[in-house]
Regions:
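An amphipathic alpha-helical interaction surface
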Residues: 1-9, 89-198
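Membrane-proximal alpha-helical anchors
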Residues: 2-111, 121, 192-198
Length: 198
């Protein structure tokens, strides 16, 4: 007995339509996957940047840890990542003061008598998270009392400007006259004669 099973011819549009729908679905899933991957990558970049974010701060005081009269000018990193200091300036009335003698002469009438100070250069240093650096210490003892008293008032008129970067080369500019550091594309070059050298 010879039995043939009749085969129904497939409609010309039915097979193609399902192929198109399957292809469109696959493309849609691929686009969603790509979008999720890009979004995840951006989130990872932001998390990495936040995990190495430095935050430079400037401060000044007039008491040493032992209670003695010592004027200090300090810069510290209160962020979570290291701060690479690219430039650092101290200005008084808009003029750079590259060292303690220059600053004390400009602000406080330091004459030919030497001032007894402890200073430190800042540019080119790396401050780890939580680290603080005193770049100028002026003890009252061994210094002219009139110069010390005047500097104790005028230290608030000294302006500190610095540019620093994270390990990912994101950079900020600190200006002691502004509330917080501002992001910059890169740190500008500052002439050596205008950099704080201590």
């Amino acid at each position: 007995m010879n039995t043939e099973i009749p085969v129904q011819p497939r409609g010309a549009t039915g097979g193609r339509l399902s192929n198109y729908l399957a292809s469109a679905f696959a493309i849609g899933v691929s686009m969603i996957s790509l979008s999720v991957a890009i979004s995840s990558n951006r989130t990872q970049e932001r998390l990495l940047a936040a995990s190495v974010w430095p935050a430079l701060e400037y401060g000044t005081g007039n008491r040493g840890a032992d209670g003695s009269d010592v004027i200090s000018m300090n810069v510290g990193n209160s962020g979570v990542g290291p701060a690479r200091l690219r430039s650092f300036q101290v200005l008084y009335q808009g003029r750079p003061a590259p060292n303690a003698a220059s600053l004390l002469t400009q602000c406080c009438g330091l004459a030919d008598a030497p001032a007894y100070t402890v200073t430190s250069g800042v540019s080119g240093r790396v401050l780890k998270a939580g680290e603080e650096l005193s770049f100028l210490l002026l003890p009252r003892e061994k210094n002219d009392a009139a110069v010390w008293d005047r500097f104790n008032r005028e230290r608030f008129n000294a302006r500190v400007q610095a540019c620093y970067c994270s390990v990912l080369d994101a950079c900020w500019r600190l200006d002691s006259e502004l509330a917080e550091p501002e992001p910059v594309a890169s740190c500008p070059d500052v002439p050596d004669a205008q950099e704080w050298s201590g």
